[in-house]
Amino acid sequence: MATKVLDSWALIAFFEDEPAAEEVEKLLMKAEAGTHKLLLSVVNWGEIYYNTMRKVSQEAAEQKAREIAGLTIELVPVEADLHLVRQAAIYKATKKLAYADAFAAALAKVRNAELVTGDQEFKEVEGEIKIGWLK
């Protein structure tokens, strides 16, 4: 089973019906069918929440949270995973990555998974992790 990490960029594109939404929807269908495992760091979940709250409202952010909960995506906590947090901190210290993006990259590295994103900021780690580029 292929394992993929979704960056917040991918889910925001899906929810806002941007050009990459169709590719993300295909991944979600594969996860539902059991052929792919999709992961999302809780830090990136929080990024989706706060972006929605800033742009729309807290009510809209809560709705988006419910929608994510209904998808076949495993939310990955960071509270007890110092290996994951350490890798994110290394990426943040050595690359030009936002902190939340560093968690998505670290999760992909630690789980040996492909990161699915369209955020060009991840070019910083392209040689270190597998990236599935969305357009």
Cite the ranges covered by each PLM segment.
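Active-site neighborhoods of divalent-metal-dependent phosphate/nucleic-acid chemistry enzymes
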Residues: 74-116
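Short, well-structured N-terminal submotif of metal-dependent ribonuclease cores
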Residues: 1-40, 53-66
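Histidine- and aromatic-rich ligand-binding microenvironments
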Residues: 6-7, 40-41, 96-98, 119, ...
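Hydrophobic helix-cap positions at the C-terminus of alpha-helices
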Residues: 27-31, 68, 91, 107, ...
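Extended, non-globular alpha-helical segments
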Residues: 63-71, 76
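Acidic, PIN/NYN-like endoribonuclease modules and their adjacent C-terminal/linker elements
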Residues: 1-3, 71-74, 105-135
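A generic structural signal for short hydrophobic patches within well-formed alpha-helices
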Residues: 11-12, 45, 122-123
